Regions:
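Extracytoplasmic
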Residues: 36, 62, 112-114, 121-124, ...
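Short, surface-exposed secondary-structure edge patches
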Residues: 43-47, 149, 223-226
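Boundary regions of SH3-family modules and the immediately adjacent low-complexity/disordered segments
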Residues: 68-110
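SH3/SH3-like beta-barrel superfamily modules
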Residues: 45-80
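Beta-loop motif signature
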Residues: 26-58
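A structural motif detector for short, solvent-exposed N-terminal "entry" segments of globular domains
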Residues: 102-148
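Exported/periplasmic cell-wall-interacting domains
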Residues: 152-155, 164-236
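Sec-dependent N-terminal signal peptides of Gram-positive bacterial secreted proteins and lipoproteins
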Residues: 2-23
Length: 236
């Protein structure tokens, strides 16, 4: 009887030491699935055939798409050679600040500064993390708008290269608090009129931009005020 109890206690201990941590890690990873912009090839070109499904990485509006083939090779295709696949927003469970932090540690995310930005394309959320005495802590969860199917928001690891108080198109629109992380891709406010006073398009929590990540005027201002250049950006 004593040996049986000892054996059961050993199994119980092994379950908690070996099995539960793995289950926990997997569940955290599954909470944040990688979003994938995809398109269907409509013209034979550079080793791809009509009907092939490719991953869309970035686009130059009206000119070309940078895509990834099934073998991992990246190629640039003419604008009209790919038709983006329209996707429904995935139904995902709500996540807590603890979930976000656990995922960041699980993935090994790091930053050169005491700040980190993590944008969850599936949930249309941008999380601000700050590093303190106890490690990373999520301090803000912000609704955002991301790239539409024709203009994907690039995924991966980036850094804030530079900041600009405003950008825009003369006499058409203006965006405030721009923070560039990759080429012409940046975080910035929603679209304002040319004077920067009235909101022209304040939509958030949707895929409607040309690849940049839009935030409310208040949230973009808050990030702009504290995020230094060199801060890591993770987009998934």
């Amino acid at each position: 009887m004593g040996k049986r109890i000892s054996f059961l206690l050993l199994l119980f201990a092994l379950f908690h030491v070996l099995i539960l941590p793995v289950m926990g890690e997997n569940s955290v990873t599954h909470l944040f699935p990688a979003y994938r912009y995809e398109g269907i090839v409509t013209k034979d070109s550079e080793g791809v055939s009509v009907g092939d499904v490719v991953k869309m990485i970035e686009s130059e509006s009206g000119k070309s798409h940078l895509v990834m083939k099934s073998n991992g090779k990246r190629i640039r295709l003419p604008w009209d050679a790919v038709t983006p696949i329209q996707k429904e927003s995935p139904s995902l469970p709500a996540v807590t600040a603890e979930d976000v932090v656990a995922f960041v540690y699980k993935m090994g995310y790091t930053s050169k500064t005491d700040y980190m930005l993590f944008t969850d394309l599936s949930r249309f959320r941008t999380y601000l993390l700050e590093y303190g005495d106890e490690g990373w802590e999520m301090t803000r969860s912000l609704p955002c708008a991301v790239g539409d199917p024709y203009h994907p928001t690039p995924s991966g690891r980036f850094e804030i290269d530079y900041k600009c108080s405003c950008i825009g198109k003369t006499d058409q629109y203006l965006c405030r608090h721009a923070m560039c992380f990759y080429g012409s891709y940046m975080y910035h406010s929603v679209l304002l009129d040319w004077k920067g006073e009235a909101v022209l398009d304040g939509r958030l929590s949707s895929a409607i931009s040309h690849g940049c990540i839009r935030l409310s005027p208040e949230d973009s201002a808050a990030l702009y005020a504290i995020i230094p250049t060199g801060t890591a950006v993770y987009i998934r």
